[in-house]
C-alpha cells in the first residue's frame, strides 16, 4: 500500500475481533518492496511510475496471491508535501480493488489538504469503496 503507510490495516485492526477475518496487509512503500513482496513487475514501475493504474492493479493481484485472500485493496499516491507534478499533483491517489473471484475495479482520486489529510481521506475512501462495491451485499 502506497501513501497510507498501512493505515487501512490499522483501521481494520482497530475493530475488536478483526483477527477472525483479517490476516495481513502489505506496506510496500518503495518500488523494491512492491516488486519483492507482491510481484509488481519492474517494467510496469519503470514505464508508468508507482502512482499509476497499472501498478495498483498489479499490487492488488499480487496481494491476493501472496495472502491467498478473498479481497485486496491497493493504494499508491502522492500525499505530499513534495513529489507532485503537473500530471500527478500532490493529493493524487490510485486505488485498485480485486477479489479472488476475478472481479476488480480501479479508481483515481485527487484529495486536498496536507499530508495527513490526504492519507486519512485515502484510507476512508478505500474502506468505503471496498464496503460499497464488494461487501455490503454479501
Residue ranges, per PLM feature:
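Short alpha-helical segments enriched in small residues
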Residues: 2-138
Amino acid at each position: 500500500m502506497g501513501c497510507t503507510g498501512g493505515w487501512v490495516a490499522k483501521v481494520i485492526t482497530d475493530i475488536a475481533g478483526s483477527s477472525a477475518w483479517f490476516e495481513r496487509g502489505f506496506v510496500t512503500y518503495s518500488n523494491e518492496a512492491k516488486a519483492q513482496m507482491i510481484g509488481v513487475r519492474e517494467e510496469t514501475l519503470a514505464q508508468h511510475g508507482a502512482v499509476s493504474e497499472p501498478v495498483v492493479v498489479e499490487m492488488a493481484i499480487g496481494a491476493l496471491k501472496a495472502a491467498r485472500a478473498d479481497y485486496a485493496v491497493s493504494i499508491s499516491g502522492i500525499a505530499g508535501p513534495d513529489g507532485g507534478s503537473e500530471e500527478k499533483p500532490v493529493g493524487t491517489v490510485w486505488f485498485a480493488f480485486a477479489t479472488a473471484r476475478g472481479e476488480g475495479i480501479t479508481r483515481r482520486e485527487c484529495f486536498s489538504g496536507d499530508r495527513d489529510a490526504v492519507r486519512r481521506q485515502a484510507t476512508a475512501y478505500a474502506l468505503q469503496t471496498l464496503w460499497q462495491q464488494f461487501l455490503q451485499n454479501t
